[in-house]
């Protein structure tokens, strides 16, 4: 069942198939199937209310996520899943998923999967990681500054998700920044492959 659920979550998030089950479930906000079955069973047997069962499920999921070995970058951005899972707005897309999973146009990922020989950033010769791309690379300063001006604070690993969850405007600003950066990187990667 978990395999089927993972496939569905990969489709929902437009994630690459290399993203771990644990990470893609958090990114999509879909409770893992085994925990969901326990939740539904408890409600069906009238042991708890739906709200109580959901609270227990999120607690179990959080404990599992905190101990998870895979999805380290996602866990760094999203250490606490409850606010993310319970949000009332904000959709993810392929580019946001790349940024949240670390599986996308990043030198460290492309080298790991054998698509390039180095982890070096194409724009500044630093090691290209999701953190570098989103928060440090000078190539994306304009997009970062625009988003930071809109949300009223400097963005970093420790506050990216918190900022997105503040309100719809912040979500849209950060999501737009991520999408523009990642979309440009994907287009640049295609051009590099043609050369």
Specify the residue positions occupied by each region the protein language model found.
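Active-site-proximal structural scaffolding
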Residues: 1-2, 17, 89, 114
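Extended C-terminal regions of large enzymes
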Residues: 4-5, 20-95
């Amino acid at each position: 069942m978990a395999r089927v659920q993972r496939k569905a979550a990969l489709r929902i998030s437009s994630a690459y198939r290399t993203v771990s089950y644990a990470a893609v479930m958090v990114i999509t906000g879909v409770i893992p199937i085994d925990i969901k079955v326990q939740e539904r069973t408890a409600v069906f047997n009238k042991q708890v209310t739906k709200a109580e069962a959901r609270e227990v499920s999120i607690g179990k999921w959080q404990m599992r996520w905190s101990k998870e070995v895979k999805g380290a970058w996602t866990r760094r951005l999203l250490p606490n899943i409850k606010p993310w899972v319970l949000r009332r707005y904000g959709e993810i897309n392929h580019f946001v998923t790349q940024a949240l999973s670390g599986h996308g146009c990043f030198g460290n990922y492309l080298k790991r999967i054998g698509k390039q020989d180095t982890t070096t950033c194409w724009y500044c010769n630093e090691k290209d990681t999701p953190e570098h791309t989103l928060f440090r690379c000078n190539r994306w300063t304009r997009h970062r500054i625009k988003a930071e001006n809109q949300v009223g604070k400097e963005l970093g690993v420790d506050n990216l998700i918190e900022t997105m969850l503040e309100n719809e405007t912040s979500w849209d600003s950060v999501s737009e920044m991520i999408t523009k950066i990642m979309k440009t990187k994907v287009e640049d990667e295609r051009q590099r492959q043609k050369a």
